[in-house]
């Protein structure tokens, strides 16, 4: 028996068929993408026109887009090429080589600092490091490592042109055939020529812990370095950074023979002293009355000591004076006495003797001794106090 069929049931779409995606034709997809791009470009052009009208000035990029849309295809290609050439020319950098030498040995020195416990120890250690003299001695005390045993050294500049402004110049020092190490040469960089060790230069950067030593070597089979190489290196770095040479140090000033020496007058001046016999002793290098004492001196120091000793011998202390002179009458009068005889006073002196000084002995007690101690002194007595 045949089962009845329902025409309405045959027209119903099963639920699983609703989830299936409809087939999209390739032509419609390409057309839709093209229309979207066209609408995007139109929106950009309309926004640029609106902003230029409202702001009072037109953006350069949007103006270029408008002009590009209004030009023919041939003019568009030439315009794009001109823009690209301008951009390449503005961003191009020129490299200029200032110096290059193929045989150089470079050693890097790094100072070894101890780890301090507190800030006070680190400050004192830093002061000791700063007080040390910079030079080859400091380089020897640091840890050394060879960064270029034998290779080329090049100094070049990168010149960047800028429109309506002076071009920028940056100098670099390059080591190695493949430019493994590049170091900028700044105006504060210090390069010193180490003449005591040969054709060597020290390069001190901002960091005092790190420094380089550059040594120029001869070519293979030749130990001599041409002089023009050193001159070219000096001319290349002296106008860029701080370059100093030990040959330019101030010479040591020679000690003068007449004005600078404080004791020179003892050798060239005449000393006239009166002895018991009344003879004069003259100390002079050329005219000396005692050649056996002065001419036998081998050095200048001995001559100075001899002259100083002779000058001291003629200065007698008060305690070494004879007892007769110590107990004699010391007169402050204007009348002079020679060998007990009175001499006429000088014409400008007063004829009257005002006072005399007589020795006086006093006794005093000392804390260190139980016996009295006699003290000798002088007492001035005026003649007005003495009754005739």
From Swiss-Prot:
BP GO annotations: peroxisome inheritance
Taxonomic source organism: Eremothecium gossypii (strain ATCC 10895 / CBS 109.51 / FGSC 9923 / NRRL Y-1056)
Gene name linked to the record: INP1
Region (Disordered) location: 1-25
Family as reported in the entry's similarity comment: Belongs to the INP1 family.
Key words, A-Z: Membrane, Peroxisome
Function: Required for peroxisome inheritance.
Name this polypeptide is given: Inheritance of peroxisomes protein 1
GO CC terms of this entry: extrinsic component of intraperoxisomal membrane
Main location: membrane
Subcellular localization(s) per the UniProt record: Peroxisome membrane
InterPro entries per UniProt: Inp1
Lineage of origin: Eukaryota, Fungi, Dikarya, Ascomycota, Saccharomycotina
Membrane topology listed for this record: Peripheral membrane protein
């Amino acid at each position: 028996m045949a089962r009845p069929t329902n025409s309405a049931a045959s027209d119903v779409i099963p639920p699983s068929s609703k989830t299936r995606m409809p087939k999209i034709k390739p032509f419609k997809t390409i057309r839709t993408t093209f229309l979207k791009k066209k609408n995007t470009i139109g929106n950009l052009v309309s926004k640029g026109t609106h902003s230029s009208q409202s702001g009072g000035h037109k953006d350069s990029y949007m103006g270029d887009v408008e002009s590009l849309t209004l030009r023919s295809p041939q003019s568009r290609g030439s315009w794009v090429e001109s823009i690209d050439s301008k951009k390449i020319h503005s961003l191009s950098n020129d490299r200029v080589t200032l110096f290059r030498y193929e045989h150089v040995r470079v050693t890097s020195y790094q100072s070894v600092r101890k780890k301090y416990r507190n800030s006070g120890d680190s400050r004192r250690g830093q002061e000791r490091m700063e007080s040390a003299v910079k030079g080859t001695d400091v380089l020897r005390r640091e840890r050394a490592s060879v960064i270029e045993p034998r290779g080329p050294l090049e100094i070049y500049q990168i010149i960047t042109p800028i429109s309506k402004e002076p071009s920028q110049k940056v100098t670099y020092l390059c080591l190695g055939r493949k430019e493994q190490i590049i170091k900028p040469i700044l105006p504060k960089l210090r390069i010193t020529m180490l003449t005591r060790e040969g054709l060597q230069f020290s390069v001190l950067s901002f960091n005092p812990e790190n420094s380089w030593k550059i040594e120029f070597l001869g070519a293979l089979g030749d130990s001599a370095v041409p002089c023009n190489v050193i001159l070219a290196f000096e001319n290349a770095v002296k106008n860029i950074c701080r370059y100093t040479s030990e040959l330019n140090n101030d010479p040591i000033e020679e000690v003068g023979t007449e004005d600078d020496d404080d004791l020179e007058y003892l050798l060239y001046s005449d000393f006239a002293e009166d002895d018991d016999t009344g003879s004069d002793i003259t100390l002079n290098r050329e005219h000396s009355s005692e050649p056996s004492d002065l001419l036998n001196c081998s050095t200048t120091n001995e001559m100075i000591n001899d002259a100083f000793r002779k000058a001291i011998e003629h200065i007698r202390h008060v305690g070494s004076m004879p007892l007769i002179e110590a107990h004699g009458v010391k007169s402050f009068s204007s009348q002079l006495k020679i060998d007990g005889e009175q001499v006429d006073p000088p014409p400008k002196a007063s004829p009257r003797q005002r006072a005399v000084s007589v020795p006086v002995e006093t006794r005093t007690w000392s804390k260190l001794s139980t016996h009295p101690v006699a003290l000798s002194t002088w007492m001035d007595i005026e003649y007005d106090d003495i009754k005739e």
